[in-house]
Amino acid sequence: MTTLIEQLITKMGLREEPNVLEKTTELVRLLELRSTNVPLQINEYGKIVLCADLASCMIGIAFDKEQALKLSGLRKSQYLNNKRMFEKLLDLNKLASVNDICVQLGLNEVARKAEELMTLFKGVAATEDMGTDTSHPQYATMAVFQACRLLKKKVSKSKLMPFSNLRPSQFQLLEQQWERMIAKHHKESKVPSSTDMEGKLKENQNENIKGHEAKKAHKPPPEDYEIWKARMLAKAQAKLKELEASQSHMDSQLLEA
């Protein structure tokens, strides 16, 4: 059995991954113990491949499901049904998170955006009091799918849907609901690149230069000295006449007194 496990692990390209062989072997042995009274309608190849699938999920490494399906000798529906049964027998009924899905499908570059969308969905669900169980894996799956769409990352729906536990028609309906939610509530947060920042800085510098030149343009030209001199003399004479008139008025009042 150990030799067969090693052969299949190697064929799946997991031989160099740390702890996969050990974890797969552990799950195969545990499955044999717990399935004593539960007849499993599956061959040894399928059993080992499914345990390797579960082991990869637990460790958090990518797993090629298409290659696994070929090696297992099972139809897709049989593969998925047996996987769910194994999860129950092995107490592995953990709900798939955004990170789990991204890791298993090799979509780590969209994980941050998917988490952002998941947080948005939870906020909208709480605000609108929808009574939604946001822990259901369909929502984490849809968050990853929509993140791929927004970031223009190609992903196959057929690879995502098994995580959601939805039928194709249900998945399509959920997809439409999320697209409406994103259109209404989601705002793209763009981190400016160094090129954008340089362009903005140059634009600000140009605006400052233009503003300085405009101020210079509005500044009146320097007054000719002779004109200034005449204006100052006229102003002084007017002030002197005003003082003389005021003094004359005061003298008249004193004489009358």
From Swiss-Prot:
It comes from the Eukaryota. One of its GO terms (cellular component) is plasma membrane. It holds the Pfam family ORC6. The keyword Chaperone does not apply. It is found in: Nucleus. Its main location: nucleus. InterPro entries: ORC6_cyclin-like_2nd (IPR054113), ORC6_cyclin_first (IPR008721), ORC6_met/pln (IPR020529). The keyword Lipid biosynthesis does not apply. One of its GO terms (molecular function) is GTPase activator activity. GO terms for biological process: DNA replication; DNA replication initiation; mitotic cell cycle; septin cytoskeleton organization. Keywords: DNA replication, DNA-binding, Nucleus. Residues 186-222 are annotated as: Disordered. Residues 197-222 have a biased composition (Basic and acidic residues). Component of the origin recognition complex (ORC) that binds origins of replication. DNA-binding is ATP-dependent, however specific DNA sequences that define origins of replication have not been identified so far. ORC is required to assemble the pre-replication complex necessary to initiate DNA replication. Belongs to the ORC6 family. ORC is composed of six subunits. This is Origin recognition complex subunit 6. The lineage of its organism: Eukaryota, Metazoa, Ecdysozoa, Arthropoda, Hexapoda.
